[in-house]
Amino acid sequence: MGLFSIFKGKKQVNTEAERRRFLMEKGRITDATIIDSQSTPEGEIVYYVYSIHGVDFESSELLTEEQMKNPLKYAPGAKVAVRFDPKNHGNSILV
């Protein structure tokens, strides 16, 4: 068995649903601030910033249909909660 075959067998599929499920189960919660939003054909994208151990992280997320029911919660300047990966602080989702 060659080296290529070993790595080929460890193929990982990392879908958005799996990422969200992982963060909902294992992610730590912190506060974030919405800094901007943008309407696109796919939906509303919000941009947010949060700080972990003094380091600022900026991210964006396409709002779900459920989140779109409360647009003021995601208006620029609003405080929201995010879950982040304790091993990769840049990986986060809005809660």
Q: Where is each model-derived feature located?
A:
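Oxidizing extracytosolic/periplasmic lumen-facing domains
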Residues: 2-95
